[in-house]
Amino acid sequence: MKILVTGFDPFGGEKINPAIEAVKRLPDEIAGNQIIKLEVPTIFYQSAEVVKKAIEKENPEMVINVGQAGGRSAITPERIAINFQAGSTPDNSGKGPKEGKIQADGLDGYFTQLPIKKMVAAIRHAGLPAQVSNSAGTYVCNHLFYEIQYLIHHDYPNLKAGFIHIPYLPSQARNGRYPSMSLDNMVTGLTVAIETAAMC
């Protein structure tokens, strides 16, 4: 199986984004599955276009998008993408999102095709904190998650996709004011999650 795994570039004044740092360090093969790694710009609409082009080029059987969720203490696979965007923080184009629906003709929400409960159980079995999340927010992470689900439901019915949020790195934790996780643990957790998803 070919699996496309994406991570966002730094945004919001940060010099690093654990998403792309962890994705870059994933092995090129997990449990016999080829891992295609892709950096994605933290920009509304452009992020989805970059991933769509990669899907067209690579024709993967699975897509897993990874993003940073400052304030969370666990690796959190997302259950649902919602058809709404909002936010006060500009994206990396310097613009904020236009508040409202992402796709005018899209469903209010799309559920992931990934076995998120099994993924969480496997990550925990590896000794790392994990839990299912029921909200990917309304920023670029949810936007990308929704756009890929919209694409699946219209053009790629056999493609499986989902989104995983990871915590801050220790260097981003503002002297312990926020939860964090080491990069090595993030890579381990994502590897376990991907292996579990690929087996189902």
UniProtKB/Swiss-Prot annotation:
Coiled coil: none annotated. InterPro entries: Peptidase_C15, Peptidase_C15-like, Peptidase_C15-like_sf, PGP-I_bact-type, PGPEP1_Cys_AS, PGPEP1_Glu_AS. Its main location: cytoplasm. Keywords: Cytoplasm, Hydrolase, Protease, Thiol protease. GO terms for biological process: proteolysis. The active site is at 78, 141, 165. It is an enzyme of class 3 (hydrolase). It catalyses: Release of an N-terminal pyroglutamyl group from a polypeptide, the second amino acid generally not being Pro. It is found in: Cytoplasm. Its EC number is 3.4.19.3. Transmembrane segments: none annotated. Pfam families: Peptidase_C15 (PF01470). Belongs to the peptidase C15 family. Removes 5-oxoproline from various penultimate amino acid residues except L-proline. NCBIfam families: PRK13197.1, pyro_pdase. Homotetramer. This is Pyrrolidone-carboxylate peptidase. It comes from Lactobacillus helveticus (strain DPC 4571).
